[in-house]
Amino acid sequence: MFAQSLARLVLLALVAGVLAGCTNSDEPPLPASVVANAPALSIPANRWRAVLVAGDNSSPAFDNGIDTLRERIAGMGVRAITVYSASPGRGQLSNLRNVGAGLHASGGDACFVYMTSHGDQSGFFLRPGRQMLSPSALDQALSQGCGERPTVVVVSACHSGTFITPPARRPNRIIIAAAATDRTSFGCGADNDYTYYDQCFLQQLDGASTWRELAEATRSCVQTLEQRLGVRRESRPQLFVGAAAANLKLPGR
């Protein structure tokens, strides 16, 4: 059943693939006709594989976000959850070697990757080893570990729109970024419990049915929060949705 559903969705990808592959990180939404015609794709919660990464421990917000997210998705029925942290004793150490190995690992019928840390236009910061995970390295790791399976990637960091590259825009993927390539994100100070983006993502998790709905609701939440707090140069969260994942449901939904 899963293979047949994915095959039907790949046909839709041929319609929207050119559009998705020729735009910059300010992604336009999929055409309404593509979303409307895409059948709902539901993967059993116990067939999802999750990789959660807190890349830095200079603020408690990063570990807090990952710890809470782990509890939430476990409550949704996800069992294969691997956590990486820059803080010893809170999970496997989030250095480039460990995170790369976790992303390369295969298994399950769908992949969920959530990474929160600092970042710049070259990639995602991993404090252990003071290394950067680049967009090309993430794309290659996902290609090997997740292949053509439905894949959802969230990068919660400054300038994280840099991960929505042409090679990464594949029909089976959803890529969610907390900020545009030329923008910073907020809420990673020593006094923050969560980053702004992580806070909104967690707040919107219960009300969404599909990953696309969750990303759009989170973006709206971030915009409202930044306006309320008087942020002058907003983060502008980004979203890419591959046509084969247009109506991919969250685990347990």
What are these model-predicted stretches?
Residues M1-V10:
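Bacterial N-terminal signal peptides that target proteins for export
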Residues S117-G147:
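A short, glycine/acidic-enriched catalytic loop
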Residues S59-D63, G91-L93, Q121-R127, P135, ...:
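Extracytoplasmic/secreted cell-surface and envelope-processing proteins
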Residues G100-G129, A157-T184:
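Active-site microenvironments of hydrolase-like enzyme catalytic domains
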Residues V152, A157-E234:
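Active-site-proximal C-terminal subdomain of hydrolase catalytic domains
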